[in-house]
Amino acid sequence: MKTVNIRGVILGEGIPKVCTPLVGRSLKELREEINLLKDIDCDLVEFRADFFEHVENIQKVKEVLLEIREALKEKPILFTFRSAKEGGEREVESEFYCKLNKEIIKTKLIDAIDIELFNEEESILELIKIAHDEDVKVVMSNHDFHKTPPKEEMISRLVKMQELGADVTKIAVMPKGSSDVLTLLEATNDMKIKYAKTPFITMSMKGVGMISRISGEVFGSAVTFGASKKASAPGQLQVKELKEILNVVHNVL
């Protein structure tokens, strides 16, 4: 498996990298979160644009993104608009989803962009090409907030993302119990041993899935998500405690 360099942060080797989401709804809330990040030891920052109240005004998204970039300096930024069907804050037409992502890629303010697998393949391929032309890495993702699919299905989705040209692949699923968490970890381990050509991210949500967020170095997941203030998904730990746990795991391996 090859590693991926996102503004100096190497995914796919060593301790899983910690990504912290910005989930403010207003410019005021985002500024408060950005100030918090100055004292937080995360590796990447995810701007969850679907939380932003003015997200349908692309110019305002660009303006707030510029503020984020200026404040975070060289910290890698992942831009994400998570659709409602995959657990995000709002639904938009597919045309707007593509237009927003295209325009944000071209700002040169981001280092990576999240593209959801379950879109029209033609649109996905176009976004990947534009991103790669602008030296923006593609994190292709799938989120199931209702269930944990069978192991083979999760692997199939991750492999499909690789085949489409994603630099990093990601799947997050909802467990109904500990058996579902084991299924996710099995899929993760199989991906690491048999199929992964690029770094990948997996997680099982809610409290019962928390073990998947801290065991990436064992099973293969390259990135884990930790909250600075408000979590963007069920089961997220705070960055400080997450980093401490990851280091404990690393030191005993």
UniProtKB/Swiss-Prot annotation:
A biological process from GO: amino acid biosynthetic process
Pfam families in the cross-refs: DHquinase_I
CDD domains: DHQase_I
Chain positions recorded as 3-dehydroquinate binding sites: 46-48, 82, 213, 232, 236
Class in the EC hierarchy, top level: lyase
The keyword ATP-binding belongs to this UniProt entry's keyword annotation: no
Keywords: Amino-acid biosynthesis, Aromatic amino acid biosynthesis, Lyase, Schiff base
Superkingdom to which the source organism belongs: Bacteria
Keyword Amino-acid biosynthesis part of the UniProt annotation: yes
Pathway(s) it belongs to: Metabolic intermediate biosynthesis; chorismate biosynthesis; chorismate from D-erythrose 4-phosphate and phosphoenolpyruvate: step 3/7
EC number: 4.2.1.10
Residues annotated as the enzyme's active site: 143 (proton donor/acceptor), 170 (schiff-base intermediate with substrate)
Cross-referenced SUPFAM superfamilies: Aldolase
GO molecular function per UniProt: 3-dehydroquinate dehydratase activity
Reactions accelerated catalytically: 3-dehydroquinate = 3-dehydroshikimate + H2O
Quaternary context: Homodimer.
NCBIfam families assigned to the protein according to its UniProt record, in alphabetical order: aroD
Role of this protein: Involved in the third step of the chorismate pathway, which leads to the biosynthesis of aromatic amino acids. Catalyzes the cis-dehydration of 3-dehydroquinate (DHQ) and introduces the first double bond of the aromatic ring to yield 3-dehydroshikimate.
Annotated family: Belongs to the type-I 3-dehydroquinase family.
Annotated protein name in UniProt: 3-dehydroquinate dehydratase
